[in-house]
Design a protein with these regions (language model features):
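Extended, charged low-complexity regulatory segments
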Residues: 1-184
Length: 185
């Protein structure tokens, strides 16, 4: 476990609690939406006339929204349980700006433009799995290649809202470990 300045266990525990609060707000909002849509569907069913094509269309649209929000709730609950498993610290060579991204199974954000956690399938996340520390690049479809200097790759073990452990690595991620984590969540 690392104890470098500014990235202590205490710092990481504070970050985890902050991220869990954001994830919980998303879960709560989705639960409210699911409840409201369930009530709307119930009310529509009570007043539903099978011969009214417009009512059928409204009901099908509400049902599709309900299914989407319910699926989003399940994703939010999963993200709440284990918000992230990795972190990358890097310097964008073009912008000359230091960045830190936490990586999880899905995005966690109050503001989508500045997520607390990025999705593991995001192009920038590929350097967590595929690159060693130092000068590396990643590609974004339709945008091209970005050059960065990767300075840290950190892996986390989070269980029951608690940071169990974390460690820094300078090697390419073990695909078996990643597969195990993603299968568990």
């Amino acid at each position: 476990m690392s104890s470098l300045p500014g990235i202590t266990r205490q710092d990481e525990e504070k970050r985890l609690q902050h991220t869990l609060e954001i994830a919980q707000r998303k879960v709560d909002a989705n639960r409210q939406s699911v409840q409201a849509l369930a009530e709307e569907l119930h009310a529509m069913q009570e007043e539903f006339d099978e011969n009214d094509k417009e009512a059928q269309t409204l009901w099908h649209n509400a049902d599709a929204r309900f299914k989407f929000v319910n699926q989003d709730l399940r994703r939010a609950e999963q993200a709440r349980k284990k918000p992230y498993f990795g972190r990358i610290d890097f310097r964008d060579k073009k912008l000359k700006k230091d960045e830190v991204y936490y990586i999880g199974r899905s995005v966690i954000a109050d503001n989508p433009a500045e997520p607390e956690v990025i999705d593991w399938r995001a192009p920038i996340a590929s350097v967590y799995y595929d690159a060693a520390l130092g000068d590396v690049s990643y590609s974004v479809k339709g945008e091209g290649k970005y050059d960065i200097t990767l300075s840290r790759k950190r892996t986390y073990e989070i269980e029951n809202d608690e940071l169990k452990d974390f460690y820094d690595s300078d090697v390419v991620a073990n695909d078996e470990l990643l597969t195990k984590y993603l299968a568990k969540s």
